[in-house]
């Protein structure tokens, strides 16, 4: 923040020692010709007061609260704790602001340093610093405990002109609030370090975004933590909630019942779920200040055990806040009541949830296993959705999962179409077709209907005759009955008995000899010697070297072929054709 020429403070002296406030005073007056850094001012002020104390020791005087010299509005004050012992003070000796050296004594307690802010001249509030010598000075008995009074509320002022300067006495109102929280704590936190840590904290937002406006019209101080938009400030709009009310009490709220923990629990949600507030400062005593209704003053609270811990406390991520202090008198649990039976409607709301909600005490139905489905399938009767059949060797399914019989399923699989429901009518036998008659012989019964060259239906006999001879079959050949070929089944045992005769290689029809003829012309004693006859025939064929000599004499085979004398192949063929069975064999 840019500093003007008149933007620095003017040190003044009040009290009995005001007469000798010349160059020998610990805080000599300086002209505001050029802005000075707080470090140099404090160092020069502390180092030039060697002859002020009664013992002659060098000491630094911190400003003491003078309630009569403050011309601010009534009831507007701010608590500010003194600087206490710290290793920083021990290392720097008297150079630390507000820290007295060893053996130092304060001669007068009327000395105070009035920081007159020229930018805030319109406001009557002043920054007053209380003295720290009440505990270390030998005159501590003379100082009452009420010396830790409150100062003017910083919430009614904007940021000071020297607020952003490095090493300044007060960097932000958050530092003052932190000092107010640790009023009686023996911990000295340099404001230069506090100011450097404040910008890195995520839960301390910038200025001008406070939830409440001040009576003076100025925006919220940049140091106060701001509450989130969706949650009310913890503390009822107080210091920890994001702002303090002015004299009019525009943004004031009633403090919590607990003086040590002024923040109030958040109102319960409709569904009982945890909420994540954004403006909650997690530390007991960090924002320990409540806003009174009419006066608007910050109460002086925060014990010794509540040391400066707001900067070290981290904000939890799970929405709940745990404190390391165990003396909450009236702090209610943050989570509130458990979940109510009425569930909130959400994007995943299904009838299953409603059924489970209505049947809170009823057990869930046990899911059926595959065995139950198998029993159900066996018990119920299936029906083909295509033809309506209820019996089939194999049940199939179509693309939609419906059952099909084996025939309909195969037809649909092979042709890609549903099997036609209208079955083709069975063909009537051709011999019994009504209205059909042969165009040649006019018969109505036949084993096979044919068509002539003109396309007319003819019986099997007329059609075959026309096909073989090329002329129509004469009507004289017409027969009333149909002559059919007699096909008798072959006997396996009889064919084995005649196997010897079929092995004779001299006749071309030896392989097609009929077994019936063998049984007719063979006597029982001859059948027993059939194997021996075959052997003698083969030997006779092997002994004949002349192929023209075909005279074979069957010894003992006169009964087999009676009167058959084979002299040449021509005679054999002629003799075979004369037999009755030859016509059937050669046909």
From Swiss-Prot:
<dbReference type="GO" id="GO:0098773">
    <property type="term" value="P:skin epidermis development"/>
</dbReference>
<keyword id="KW-0479">Metal-binding</keyword>
<dbReference type="GO" id="GO:0060045">
    <property type="term" value="P:positive regulation of cardiac muscle cell proliferation"/>
</dbReference>
<dbReference type="GO" id="GO:0010467">
    <property type="term" value="P:gene expression"/>
</dbReference>
<dbReference type="GO" id="GO:0032911">
    <property type="term" value="P:negative regulation of transforming growth factor beta1 production"/>
</dbReference>
<keyword id="KW-0805">Transcription regulation</keyword>
<dbReference type="GO" id="GO:0001949">
    <property type="term" value="P:sebaceous gland cell differentiation"/>
</dbReference>
<feature type="compositionally biased region" description="Low complexity">
    <location>
        <begin position="502"/>
        <end position="523"/>
    </location>
</feature>
<feature type="compositionally biased region" description="Low complexity">
    <location>
        <begin position="17"/>
        <end position="47"/>
    </location>
</feature>
<dbReference type="GO" id="GO:0071371">
    <property type="term" value="P:cellular response to gonadotropin stimulus"/>
</dbReference>
<dbReference type="GO" id="GO:0060575">
    <property type="term" value="P:intestinal epithelial cell differentiation"/>
</dbReference>
<dbReference type="GO" id="GO:0000976">
    <property type="term" value="F:transcription cis-regulatory region binding"/>
</dbReference>
<dbReference type="GO" id="GO:0042475">
    <property type="term" value="P:odontogenesis of dentin-containing tooth"/>
</dbReference>
<dbReference type="GO" id="GO:0060038">
    <property type="term" value="P:cardiac muscle cell proliferation"/>
</dbReference>
<dbReference type="GO" id="GO:0031016">
    <property type="term" value="P:pancreas development"/>
</dbReference>
<dbReference type="GO" id="GO:0003163">
    <property type="term" value="P:sinoatrial node development"/>
</dbReference>
<dbReference type="InterPro" id="IPR008013">
    <property type="entry name" value="GATA_N"/>
</dbReference>
<dbReference type="GO" id="GO:0000987">
    <property type="term" value="F:cis-regulatory region sequence-specific DNA binding"/>
</dbReference>
<dbReference type="GO" id="GO:0010666">
    <property type="term" value="P:positive regulation of cardiac muscle cell apoptotic process"/>
</dbReference>
<dbReference type="GO" id="GO:0035987">
    <property type="term" value="P:endodermal cell differentiation"/>
</dbReference>
<dbReference type="GO" id="GO:0035239">
    <property type="term" value="P:tube morphogenesis"/>
</dbReference>
<dbReference type="GO" id="GO:0045893">
    <property type="term" value="P:positive regulation of DNA-templated transcription"/>
</dbReference>
<comment type="function">
    <text>Transcriptional activator that regulates SEMA3C and PLXNA2. May regulate genes that protect epithelial cells from bacterial infection. Involved in gene regulation specifically in the gastric epithelium. Involved in bone morphogenetic protein (BMP)-mediated cardiac-specific gene expression. Binds to BMP response element (BMPRE) DNA sequences within cardiac activating regions.</text>
</comment>
<dbReference type="GO" id="GO:0051145">
    <property type="term" value="P:smooth muscle cell differentiation"/>
</dbReference>
<dbReference type="Pfam" id="PF00320">
    <property type="entry name" value="GATA"/>
</dbReference>
<dbReference type="GO" id="GO:0070848">
    <property type="term" value="P:response to growth factor"/>
</dbReference>
<keyword id="KW-0539">Nucleus</keyword>
<feature type="region of interest" description="Disordered">
    <location>
        <begin position="17"/>
        <end position="73"/>
    </location>
</feature>
<keyword id="KW-0238">DNA-binding</keyword>
<dbReference type="GO" id="GO:0002759">
    <property type="term" value="P:regulation of antimicrobial humoral response"/>
</dbReference>
<dbReference type="GO" id="GO:0140297">
    <property type="term" value="F:DNA-binding transcription factor binding"/>
</dbReference>
<dbReference type="GO" id="GO:0006644">
    <property type="term" value="P:phospholipid metabolic process"/>
</dbReference>
<dbReference type="GO" id="GO:1902894">
    <property type="term" value="P:negative regulation of miRNA transcription"/>
</dbReference>
<feature type="region of interest" description="Disordered">
    <location>
        <begin position="209"/>
        <end position="259"/>
    </location>
</feature>
<dbReference type="GO" id="GO:0005667">
    <property type="term" value="C:transcription regulator complex"/>
</dbReference>
<dbReference type="GO" id="GO:0045892">
    <property type="term" value="P:negative regulation of DNA-templated transcription"/>
</dbReference>
<dbReference type="GO" id="GO:0045944">
    <property type="term" value="P:positive regulation of transcription by RNA polymerase II"/>
</dbReference>
<protein>
    <recommendedName>
        <fullName>Transcription factor GATA-6</fullName>
    </recommendedName>
</protein>
<dbReference type="GO" id="GO:0003682">
    <property type="term" value="F:chromatin binding"/>
</dbReference>
<keyword id="KW-0832">Ubl conjugation</keyword>
<dbReference type="GO" id="GO:0030513">
    <property type="term" value="P:positive regulation of BMP signaling pathway"/>
</dbReference>
<dbReference type="GO" id="GO:0009410">
    <property type="term" value="P:response to xenobiotic stimulus"/>
</dbReference>
